[in-house]
């Protein structure tokens, strides 16, 4: 109350910032007559003038008013579109490392041209990030004439481009693309074999469209590049056969958990847990199938993979539904994005879940993958020098933007007053009653010739409603993941009088619904366009547009509340654009997931007490408040999930930064011999210390063991025991110096044989190959550590602190293993000529040409648009005979694991 009173007297911080920016808008408006008087050539010259002033040390903020005036005038000449004052304010907000909340239809695409132009002037590049490839290409092509006029280069970055095309795209002043593609390019650059293979340059300025969708909805799980691991398809099939024998325990109270159920389900957390009875039952079933020894336990260390597979199978059957979480298309399980309702071709869930769903549906099971590189969006976007974003709905997540990204949210006023009528929610007892009421509302709107957009949260719901409308003979179009090929056509005409469109989650669709339909879409259909035909289409459209406005504009119907208020607001925001009339209403039932999980019992009891009958609905502030509280709970939980992910990933991020910086230095260096010398000294001293404890008596030395180690790992024969017996002053320091001298001498002989240039290249190849291999294994170790670390809480230990401590120990061990690896390989391998170096490079390239997946895992966890790696695609050699596993004994007979012996190269 006091805060509200304070804001009334002094205004909010948002108001004060807007007030300051309005003064800059006035300055830009005063420049307008001067810039209107410039010729095209003079206006184009402004870009070179601004660049010179920046090179001379002038600050970018000083140039802002003139730069914005230049873009506004150029836009007027090129597009016939003049930036509104509100769009100028939006441009300033975006230049100041902030988030601009701009309502639907306020012209975000045009607003973005202002900060993009200004921040492209220093020549370091601007990345404009969109939610899908279609929008990236559309916006780049739409704005290209404007930037061409101003002398700036524009490109788009989409999956499947050749490396040289990608490199050219990143060299452009302004590059459009998706968040996933920019992130994957960063990871790919840090897996490159040569400096020229990298495509990105310095990450300068990122402008994120639909920033809430990208930095919040998609930030729960990381971007992952993975490669094929071992085949375990048969295991998934066997586990799938066990699931029908397992029974869910209905009661989840701990007191009643000793019942006969095998597992419990936590719908809120989308988790599943085995009961004690379930563990025993599964062990019996596994023993019957011969998958578990008679005296063995499911929880013994050797059987962890069995537990992993049974858990994945249970989750596939009980937590993931066909036509809600995924669809079957061309004999493949295709994930449906819970945020946008789109199918995500090739995207895969991790942790074996996708394979378990494939086994459940009886489609071919794809192999599991191993992580090669990974980063979260939080840590990727924090690499940019400047970051800004825009969306229609950011205010509900303002705290998260501020706390995680350091981005302040500024809510911009609309250019014209908002007149949309947002009606109160209607709550019914059952889903059937709710859908009947929705159908009646649609029929009423059709009588009034009003267009209707119905938003559903899943494909299943959209098809259910579609069947109901078909029975009632109400014509309609369905826009969901199954038919998104026709999406643009459907949306283009969704504003025509009496049109009914059913759409799964509209978030991130990126296309405005224009009242009366899109006359431009009609023009594009003309085989032979002429001015007369275009004018006729425009006149017909104007009549339809006026008729829809007269009828009350677009009506939005929500079939249930989403777990995030922001997604509900995005659906509502489809109506009432640019001051148009419109209305919205949500229809709910006690059977909706959000109501069932969070609010059902209390509200259900209250509704029955009020004497509600079948088909009746209630509108009451208490109920609305209960729903909003439920949404806040979910939003709070999701924020905690993302925050926790970031806290854990920050540990990995520090390690990632060290490894990637070191790797890039290696790539850029022509000669790494100094690094090799330093590593060799460290390794030899460590090895000697294992057999000759520092400052110890000679009686405690294990010289025989050291001789064998030097012979086996470094290929040098030294009579250490003989030296000790024959020399009076053979102290520890003398021993260390002598061993190092002999190792250096042997290495110098190798260098004289092949020449320094060949050896320098070989050193670099081995160093990069070993670093990549150890980093890959380290990522797997970090994954395993992360998955089990929460159990430390039962031992009264802080899991995060334990994770930090053990992650550091793992990282230290990895670096030591890497150094030993490099020195032993360089000591043992005989390099005869340049061909041997080329052979190592070819092996690295062959490993790289193996099929890869590029995944962005969603909360499931699910993964993004895996594109198969098409770069350097080569035929794979055919291996005759059994493949040697990395952990199996080496066939050479050394007694070591294959990965530590001949598997190194």
From Swiss-Prot:
It catalyses: ATP + H2O + cellular proteinSide 1 = ADP + phosphate + cellular proteinSide 2. It comes from the Bacteria. Its cofactor is Zn(2+). Residues 836-905 are annotated as: Disordered. Residues 896-905 have a biased composition (Basic residues). This is Protein translocase subunit SecA. InterPro entries: Helicase_ATP-bd, Helicase_C-like, P-loop_NTPase, SEC_C_motif, SecA, SecA_CS, SecA_DEAD, SecA_motor_DEAD. The gene is secA. Its main location: membrane. May bind 1 zinc ion per subunit. It is a peripheral membrane protein. One of its GO terms (cellular component) is plasma membrane. Zn(2+) binds at residues 890, 892, 901-902.
């Amino acid at each position: 109350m006091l805060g509200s009173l304070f804001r009334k007297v002094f205004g909010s911080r948002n108001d004060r910032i807007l007030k300051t920016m309005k003064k800059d808008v006035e300055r830009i408006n005063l420049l307008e007559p001067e810039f209107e008087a410039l010729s095209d050539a003079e206006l184009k010259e402004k870009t070179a003038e601004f660049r010179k002033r920046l090179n001379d040390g002038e600050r970018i903020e000083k140039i802002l008013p003139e730069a914005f005036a230049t873009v506004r005038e150029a836009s007027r000449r090129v597009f016939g579109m003049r930036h509104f004052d509100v769009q100028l304010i939006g441009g300033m907000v975006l230049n100041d490392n902030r988030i601009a909340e701009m309502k639907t239809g306020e012209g975000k695409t045009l607003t973005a041209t202002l900060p993009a132009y200004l921040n492209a002037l220093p020549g370091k590049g601007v990345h404009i990030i969109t939610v899908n490839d279609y929008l990236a290409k559309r916006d780049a092509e739409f704005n290209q004439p404007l930037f061409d006029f101003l002398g700036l280069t524009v490109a788009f970055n989409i999956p499947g481009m050749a490396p040289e095309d990608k490199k050219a795209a990143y060299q452009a002043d302004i590059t459009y693309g998706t968040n996933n593609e920019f992130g994957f390019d960063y990871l790919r650059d840090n897996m490159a074999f040569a400096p020229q293979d990298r495509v990105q340059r310095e990450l300068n300025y990122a402008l994120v469209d639909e920033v809430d969708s990208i930095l919040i909805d998609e930030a729960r799980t990381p971007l992952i590049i993975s490669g094929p691991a071992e085949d375990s398809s048969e295991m998934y099939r066997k586990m799938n056969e066990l699931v029908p024998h397992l029974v869910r325990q209905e009661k989840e109270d701990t007191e009643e958990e000793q019942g006969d159920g095998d597992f419990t389900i936590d719908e809120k957390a989308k988790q599943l847990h085995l009961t004690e009875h379930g563990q025993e039952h599964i062990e019996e079933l596994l023993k019957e199938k011969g998958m578990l020894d008679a005296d063995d336990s499911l929880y013994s260390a050797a059987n962890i993979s069995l537990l992993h597979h049974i858990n994945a199978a249970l989750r596939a059957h009980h937590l993931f539904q066909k036509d809600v979480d995924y669809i079957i298309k061309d004999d493949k399980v295709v994930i449906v994005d819970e945020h946008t309702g789109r199918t995500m071709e090739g995207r895969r869930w991790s942790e074996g879940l996708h394979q378990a769903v494939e086994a459940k549906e009886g489609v071919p099971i794809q192999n599991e993958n191993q992580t090669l590189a990974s980063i979260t969006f939080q840590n990727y976007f924090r690499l940019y020098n400047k970051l800004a974003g825009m969306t229609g709905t950011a205010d509900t997540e303002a705290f998260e933007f501020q706390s995680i990204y350091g981005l302040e949210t500024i809510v911009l006023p609309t250019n014209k007053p908002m007149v949309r009528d947002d009606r109160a929610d209607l709550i019914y007892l059952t889903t059937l009653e709710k859908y009947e009421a929705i159908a009646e509302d649609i029929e009423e709107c059709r009588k009034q010739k009003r267009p209707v957009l119905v938003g559903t949260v899943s494909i299943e719901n959209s098809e259910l409603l579609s069947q109901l409308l078909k029975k009632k003979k109400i014509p309609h179009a369905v826009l969901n993941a199954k038919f998104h090929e026709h999406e643009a056509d459907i949306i283009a005409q969704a504003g025509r009088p009496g049109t009914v469109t059913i759409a799964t989650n509209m978030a991130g669709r990126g296309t405005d619904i224009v009242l009366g339909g899109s006359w431009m879409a009609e023009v594009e259909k003309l085989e032979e366009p002429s001015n007369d035909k275009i004018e006729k289409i425009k006149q017909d459209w104007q009549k339809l547009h006026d008729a829809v406005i007269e009828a009350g504009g677009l009506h939005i119907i929500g079939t249930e509340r989403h777990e995030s208020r922001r997604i509900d607001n995005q659906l509502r925001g489809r109506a009432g654009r640019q001051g148009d009339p419109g209305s919205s209403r949500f229809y709910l039932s006690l059977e909706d997931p959000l109501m069932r999980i969070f609010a059902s019992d209390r509200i259900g009891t209250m509704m029955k007490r009020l004497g509600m009958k079948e088909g009746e609905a209630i509108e009451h502030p208490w109920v609305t408040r209960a729903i909003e509280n439920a949404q806040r709970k979910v939003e709070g939980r999701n924020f905690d999930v993302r925050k926790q992910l970031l806290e854990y990933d920050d540990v990995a991020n520090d390690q990632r930064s060290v490894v990637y910086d070191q790797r890039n230095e290696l790539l850029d260096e022509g000669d790494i011999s100094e690094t090799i010398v330093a590593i060799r000294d460290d390794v030899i001293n460590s090895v000697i210390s294992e057999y000759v404890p520092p400052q110890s008596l000679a009686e405690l030395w294990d010289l025989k063991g050291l001789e064998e180690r030097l012979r086996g790992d470094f290929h040098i024969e030294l009579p250490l025991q003989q030296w000790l017996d024959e020399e009076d002053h053979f102290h520890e320091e003398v021993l260390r110096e002598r061993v190092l001298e002999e190792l250096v001498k042997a290495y110098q002989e190798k260098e004289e044989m092949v020449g320094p240039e060949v050896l320098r290249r070989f050193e670099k190849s081995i160093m990069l190959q070993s670093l990549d291999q150890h980093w890959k294994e380290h990522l797997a170790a970090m994954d395993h550590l992360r998955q089990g670390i929460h159990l430390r809480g039962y031992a009264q230990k802080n899991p995060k602190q334990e994770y930090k401590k053990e992650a550091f120990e793992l990282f230290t061990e990895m670096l030591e293993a890497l150094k030993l690896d490099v020195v032993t390989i360089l000591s043992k391998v005989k390099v005869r000529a340049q061909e041997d170096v080329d052979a190592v490079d070819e092996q690295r390239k062959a490993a790289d040409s193996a099929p890869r997946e590029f995944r962005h895992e969603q909360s499931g966890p699910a993964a993004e648009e895996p594109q198969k790696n098409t770069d350097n695609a080569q035929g794979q050699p055919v291996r005759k005979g059994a493949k040697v596993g990395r952990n199996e004994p080496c066939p050479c007979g050394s007694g070591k694991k294959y990965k530590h012996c001949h598997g190194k190269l």
